[in-house]
């Protein structure tokens, strides 16, 4: 807890915030701590990323590593669109330095759910689950935006789903952050159809 200008507040340290601010770092964190995540590759150079993209047969999501105003995640419909998105991020620097590194991951189908969790390093407490509306058009169509809104609680966040999230994602994340000396968590999850 910090007191700045007389306002009591709390939040993640800069080191902990890296889990939200760097997609490559958070994917490696999940892998290191055996937390379920989509199949992925992290890339620092365009040619390696391009070759990886050519080698996969599944639909992908391409993510700029850094913060890009909520617009750095591209879900291409075709391999050509994927190559275009990769080129725009890494060669044309569409998102500036945020796209110097990218994650190319398997596209998972399902409903997305956000869970904001607080912890002292052992106990976990979560706010009601929320569902974001990131796309620019109705019906979850169009490109992602910086945020079109959300609502909570969401009906997809059933008691059973939340218990599974706590058991397989939240608690292992807290345990991993404690082992790494970092604590705070915001989870954006996809429940598979």
Could you tell me what each predicted segment is?
Residues 10-11, 38, 61, 103-105:
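Structural detector of well-ordered beta-strand residues that form the stable sheet scaffold
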Residues 2-5, 15-16, 48-49, 81, ...:
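Catalytic-core regions of core metabolic enzymes
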Residues 57-79:
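Conserved anion/nucleotide-ligand pocket segment
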Residues 72-193:
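Internal nucleotide-binding/catalytic subdomain
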Residues 7-10, 28-36, 64-71, 143-158:
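Acidic/polar active-site rim loop that often engages polyanionic ligands
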Residues 21-52:
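Short, glycine-/small-residue-rich phosphate/pyrophosphate-handling segment
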Residues 1-21, 35-42:
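A short, GP-enriched loop/loop-strand-helix hinge that lies immediately N-terminal to
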Residues 18-24, 137-138:
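Short, charged, surface-exposed secondary-structure boundary motifs
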